[in-house]
């Protein structure tokens, strides 16, 4: 959003849709989608790209919500940031299930899915004694995830995000 704000004067109007995980309701919908798409008796590890910024907290929140909804054998890990491979490895060991399915938590299952998930993470888990399957289907291939993005785009078309400082200025001026 900050990058686009610099370009705003050059356009009549710019709208930016929200990311997949923005509201608590978004997280709940994604938990419902993941649990419906990847149900089973084995552990499932969704691997996101991650980041070293505070935005990485969204992965931990999603992991927490999966567990809170009763999906204790579904885990979220990240290539960069938290939850790290080491964090997820401890959780997988506590599942007492030696079969794991790796799934990219990425819109497109591209280079990271092949190089990091299907190669590095799979190999590291196999060295720890796990039998590992991979499902390299990107989130963008799931119709219910597509619907969430469409919902966010429609919302952005109909409602303009108001910056908090602009909102506070308006409130201050109304009080005068």
Q: Where are each of the predicted segments found?
A:
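Extended amphipathic ligand-handling, pore-lining, and cofactor/metal-binding catalytic surfaces
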Residues: 1-176
């Amino acid at each position: 959003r900050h990058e686009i704000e610099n370009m705003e004067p050059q356009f009549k109007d710019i709208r930016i849709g929200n990311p997949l995980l923005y509201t608590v309701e978004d997280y709940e919908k994604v938990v419902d989608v993941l649990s419906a798409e990847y149900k089973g008796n084995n552990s499932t590890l969704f691997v996101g790209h991650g980041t070293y910024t505070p935005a990485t907290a969204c992965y931990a929140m999603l992991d927490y919500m999966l567990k809170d909804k009763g999906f204790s054998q579904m885990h979220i890990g990240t290539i960069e940031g938290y939850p790290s491979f080491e964090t997820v490895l401890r959780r997988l060991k506590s599942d007492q299930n030696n079969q794991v399915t790796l799934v990219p938590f990425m819109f497109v299952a591209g280079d990271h899915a092949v190089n990091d998930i299907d190669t590095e993470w799979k190999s590291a888990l196999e060295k720890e004694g796990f039998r590992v399957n991979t499902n390299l289907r990107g989130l963008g291939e799931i119709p219910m995830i597509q619907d969430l993005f469409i919902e966010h785009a429609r919302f952005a078309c109909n409602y303009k995000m108001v910056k908090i400082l602009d909102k506070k200025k308006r409130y201050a001026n109304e009080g005068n």
